[in-house]
Amino acid sequence: MKINKNKPKIAASILSADFSILGKEVKDIDKAGADIIHIDVMDGSFVPNITIGPDVVSSIRNYSKKIFDVHLMIKNPANYVDSFYKAGADIITIHLEADNYPIRTLQYIKNLGIKAGVSINPSTSEESLRYILDYCDLVLIMLVNPGFGGQKTIPSQVKKLHNIKNMISEKNKKNILLEVDGGVNVNNFSALVEAGADILVAGSSIFNAGKKMYNKNIKNLRNSWKRSDNKENF
């Protein structure tokens, strides 16, 4: 699975979808033009919310052939990697703060033949990633405190994104994908791309207005990248 870095990719976060018709939501967001399906897995312990497990991921896999980007916001993620791989994950991202042996877990994910990602919370320094970049395919920067959708981006995290992009360049790891999650909208999309984001996770800004707006909302995000007048000042 190869993700082209020439243009930013939009990952639709189903955390903001209607869970009562989740399969249909995945199908609709696929047709609307999302590049990636972003799936937040929460355990109610590492983050203050509970979402879905591997059985649900497996049940929606047939509704889309797009990349399934599974973000494990759970303690001891290594215990669940196999289950989510078998459920159809194409990318599995673990939190650096939630795993005592992140390098081992990342190596295990890569050995399954899928992409391995590592994520850090807003309070975690980007320097903590320096030793781990050799072992991951993707870095996910949380622009908000994880657990709930609909939050506003924490401005300092955009500088962190820029710093991580520079760190990746310094280490000559330019194939590593940079993903951002939290408060992504038409007003900050372009600035986040300029700061280094390859994949931008969007939930509320896609789903909130209902199915009829999915395609338009995704197009608006893409078009905002081409305009400079909509940039937020972080």
Predicted regions and their residues:
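Glycine/Thr-rich beta-alpha phosphate-binding loop at enzyme active sites
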Residues: 43-51, 55, 122, 130-162, ...
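N-terminal amphipathic alpha-helix/helix-capping segment at the start of soluble metabolic enzymes
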Residues: 1-16, 23-24, 229-234
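N-terminal active-site wall of soluble small-molecule enzyme domains
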Residues: 41-111
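C-terminal helical cap(s) of enzyme catalytic domains, especially alpha/beta-barrels
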Residues: 109, 193, 207-234
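Conserved, mostly hydrophobic/aromatic
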Residues: 22, 29, 40, 84, ...
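Hydrophobic faces of well-ordered beta-strands that scaffold small-molecule active sites
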Residues: 8-13, 37-39, 60, 68-72, ...
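Glycine-rich phosphate-binding active-site loops on the catalytic face of alpha/beta enzymes
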Residues: 92-100, 140-152, 195-217
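Catalytic cores of alpha/beta
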Residues: 26, 78-86, 124-136, 182-200
